[in-house]
């Protein structure tokens, strides 16, 4: 934005009344900002869309309960991360931007790049990786693509938002080094390299401060350190104290909560709790964004090339699928052999997750409908098992008979819809048992089983010996079926590599004893040892390591050259098929003074090679290659030493190793190894209070609920309420929640309410409920029924009257706002 434009926006802000300034910082509807007609400041439209646009045609709601317009459903972020292809990410971003523009969407709420701290997070399908470097690079590519079409990307959720349980009322207790190195680095890359113009703050607290009110996070780090010059948007209903948010650097509270927050802002300016300069700065940043997104904007093409985007979704899915196993080269399929296709997922594919990201696709392929397009000898097809876990004995017998008479069985299975959803964490890593029972029975009558997996996060795989081949599609979008068959038939050579580790069991995971949380807090005792950083350092054997994936060809590595600013390495396709390899560069410092993982991903490159072709690749070092966060000095530093540079096909398959000397700039090391023995070994599953306190640098907050409930306590905490009515409501909500789970489809509305704090009632009702009324509700819950009812009734009429007054003020009718 040029200087003249900036000055013009400043003049606009100067012309605004305080009522207009306060009002514009909260939404007008579920998805729209507030316009100021008097000054020709228009409204803009925000929409979900990490992997497809979810613009609702009618009344808007946060969780997608009302139908949305048709849009391309691309593979989810967890899937695309397995491609390790930034060019592909940018291409998908461009398509998302085109579709958003065609629907007059100004800000696309994505991508999501929270770290996969635990496989149990119900929203892992929306996130890229357990590794911040890979997450950041892939997010930056999406952002560049989206914003090239005149639409803002809004990466989310800043920060440390790694669980769904009580996500709006949870305090993440995490040390500053872990925060910086693991949970903020991906966002740093997204801002610096993707040049994101919007950021969504997370629901949770970070060390006792709500992310949206954390000035250290939103101003000191985001704006000053990273150079962010866009707007910060709350997650929907995620504003706790709007005044504190504005002071900290947050620009837009969503969705609409009427004028309650605006009145709070005005009162805060009048009583000196909020500087008017801070208010003007937030308004100026928001107005800059609004005018940039709307000024001189051409009428967008209401149509996008649906077929081209479908083919892009197919290409993306094919490049992101991982071949985990291929014994005796059973794949690609021999077209002469008879094939039985078994599994409900072949008829009703699971191609996306549940929640606010759910897309209404332009079309959806399923394997059963498109098999005839391929030259395959299909003996027959059947579901074999019931999606909801029930057993149909006739269908099961038919499946076994079909398998017995076929040369090869394609078995389609995975996690069902209730297993992964926004608002709901998983309780285990297992695939539904009825699917595994059938798989094991089939393996007794046919040893040639090809397993086709659908799941948005890591799963336990004790049954893997039943399959000769396993192709993992993750949640591969609307064109996933054709992408799967392209790989099975050899039309496409698989090149996906895991962006997360697959442990043998959940009990192996580093946060096993700490996840998801205590009642009020979630303690990040595992520190920097997340994912492969833990397994690799503590020598824990896993099922499939980070970065792993097979191909129909073979690659060799040679001629590693380590230079001052990067490495060069030659890669050769030694097989008989064209294919792609993901070359991964890891860095470690043996015998480091400051504890650290044995190796960390610091660079990667995907290269396409014809059979017999060789190519030299260059992977540069950057400002993140050797750094660590020194909590003692509060800055990034480099430790002096001989660093190992390890190049390979996965974290466990290092082909070439070299060293480089680095002179550090440490001004004093932060830790006493004698007080932190387990952090220095990486064995972090049983960290004591004393050792975590040493890492954290403060007393550990009490994570238990106690005393009466407050506005920031979750509604599910009404289990402890003094009011019988409140406890009855809790039991009803719990019963409804369990009923939806038993039916195999999560009730997103119930899940959202269940984990929502009481203040969310005011933030999510469009101005119908004020904070005064919420305090009345809490009084009633705590047993003060009459006092609560009095506040609710009085608050209702005062809120209604004050909202009408505010409307008149904005329309220029005069009067004062209370």
Feature roles, as predicted:
Residues 694-818:
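Long, low-hydrophobicity ectodomains and other hydrophilic envelope-associated domains
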Residues 652, 658-728:
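Charged, amphipathic alpha-helical linkers/stalks
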Residues 623-670:
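Terminal connector regions
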Residues 1-624, 642-647, 651, 763, ...:
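Glycoside hydrolase catalytic-domain context in secreted enzymes
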């Amino acid at each position: 934005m040029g200087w003249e434009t900036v000055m013009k926006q400043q003049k606009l802000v100067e012309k605004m009344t305080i009522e207009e300034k306060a009002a514009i910082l909260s939404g007008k509807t579920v998805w729209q900002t507030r316009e100021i007609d008097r000054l020709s400041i228009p409204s803009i439209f925000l929409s979900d869309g990490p992997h497809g646009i979810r613009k609702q045609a009618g009344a808007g709601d946060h969780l997608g309960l009302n139908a949305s317009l048709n849009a391309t459903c691309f593979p989810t972020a967890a899937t695309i991360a397995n491609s390790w292809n930034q060019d592909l990410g940018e291409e998908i971003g461009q398509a998302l931007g085109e579709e958003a523009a065609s629907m007059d969407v100004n800000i696309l709420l994505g991508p999501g790049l929270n770290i996969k701290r635990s496989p149990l997070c119900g929203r892992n399908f929306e996130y890229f990786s357990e590794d911040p470097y890979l997450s950041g690079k892939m997010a930056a590519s999406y952002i560049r693509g989206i914003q090239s079409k005149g639409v803002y990307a809004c990466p989310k959720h800043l920060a440390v938002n790694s669980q769904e349980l009580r996500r709006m009322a949870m305090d993440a207790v995490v040390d500053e080094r872990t925060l910086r190195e693991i949970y903020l680095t991906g966002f740093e890359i997204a801002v610096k390299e993707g040049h994101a113009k919007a950021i969504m703050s997370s629901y949770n607290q970070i060390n006792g401060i709500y992310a949206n009110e954390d000035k250290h996070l939103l101003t000191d780090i985001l704006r000053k350190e990273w150079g962010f010059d866009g707007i910060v948007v709350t997650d929907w209903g995620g504003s706790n104290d709007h005044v504190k948010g504005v002071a900290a650097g947050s620009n837009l509270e969503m969705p609409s909560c009427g004028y309650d927050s605006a009145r709070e802002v005005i009162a805060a300016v009048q009583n000196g709790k909020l500087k008017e300069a801070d208010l003007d700065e937030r308004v100026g940043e928001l107005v800059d964004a609004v005018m940039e997104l709307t000024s001189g904007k051409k009428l967008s093409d209401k149509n996008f090339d649906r077929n081209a985007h479908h083919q892009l979704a197919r290409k993306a899915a094919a490049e992101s699928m991982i071949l985990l196993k291929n014994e005796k080269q059973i794949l690609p399929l021999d077209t002469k052999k008879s094939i039985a296709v078994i599994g409900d997922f072949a008829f009703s594919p699971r191609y996306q997750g549940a929640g606010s990201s759910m897309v209404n696709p332009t079309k959806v392929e399923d394997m059963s409908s498109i098999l005839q397009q391929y030259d395959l000898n299909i003996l027959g097809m059947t579901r074999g098992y019931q999606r909801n876990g029930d057993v149909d004995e006739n269908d099961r017998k038919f499946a076994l008979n079909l398998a017995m008479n076929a040369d090869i069985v394609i078995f389609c299975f995975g996690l069902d819809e209730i297993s992964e959803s926004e608002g709901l964490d998983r309780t285990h890593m297992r695939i539904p048992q009825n699917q595994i029972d059938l798989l094991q029975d089939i393996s007794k009558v046919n040893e040639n089983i090809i397993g086709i997996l659908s799941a948005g996060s890591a799963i336990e795989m004790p049954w893997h010996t039943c399959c000769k081949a396993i192709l993992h599609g993750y949640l591969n979008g609307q064109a996933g079926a054709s992408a799967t068959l392209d790989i099975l038939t050899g039309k496409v050579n698989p090149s996906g590599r895991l962006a997360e580790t697959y442990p043998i069991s959940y009990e192996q995971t580093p946060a096993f004893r700490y996840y998801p949380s205590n009642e009020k807090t979630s303690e990040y005792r595992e520190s920097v040892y997340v994912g492969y950083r833990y397994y690799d350092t503590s020598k824990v054997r896993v099922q499939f390591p980070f970065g792993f994936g097979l191909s129909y060809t073979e690659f060799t590595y040679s001629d590693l050259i380590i230079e001052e600013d990067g490495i060069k390495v030659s890669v050769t396709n030694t097989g008989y098929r064209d294919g792609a390899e993901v070359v991964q560069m890891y860095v470690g410092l043996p015998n480091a003074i400051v504890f650290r993982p044995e190796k960390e991903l610091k660079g990667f490159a995907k290269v396409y090679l014809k059979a017999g072709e060789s190519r030299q690749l260059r992977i540069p070092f950057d400002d993140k290659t050797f750094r660590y966060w020194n909590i003692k000095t509060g800055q990034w530093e480099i430790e002096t030493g001989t660093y190992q540079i390890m190049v390979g096909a996965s974290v466990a398959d290092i082909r070439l190793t070299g060293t480089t000397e680095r002179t550090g700039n440490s001004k004093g090391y932060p830790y006493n190894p004698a007080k932190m023995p387990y952090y220095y070994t990486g064995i972090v599953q049983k960290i004591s209070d004393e050792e975590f306190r040493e890492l954290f640098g403060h007393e550990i907050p009490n994570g238990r609920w106690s005393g009466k409930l407050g506005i920031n306590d979750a509604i599910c905490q009404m289990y402890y309420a003094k009011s019988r009515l409140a406890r009855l409501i809790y039991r009803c909500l719990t019963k409804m929640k369990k009923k939806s789970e038993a039916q195999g489809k999560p009730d997103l509305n119930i899940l959202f309410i269940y984990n929502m704090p009481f203040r969310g009632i005011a933030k999510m009702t469009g101005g119908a409920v004020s904070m005064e009324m919420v305090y009345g509700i809490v009084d009633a819950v705590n047993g003060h029924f009459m006092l609560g009812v009095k506040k609710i009734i009085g608050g209702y009429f005062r809120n209604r009257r004050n909202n009408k007054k505010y409307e008149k003020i904005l329309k220029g009718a005069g009067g004062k706002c209370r």
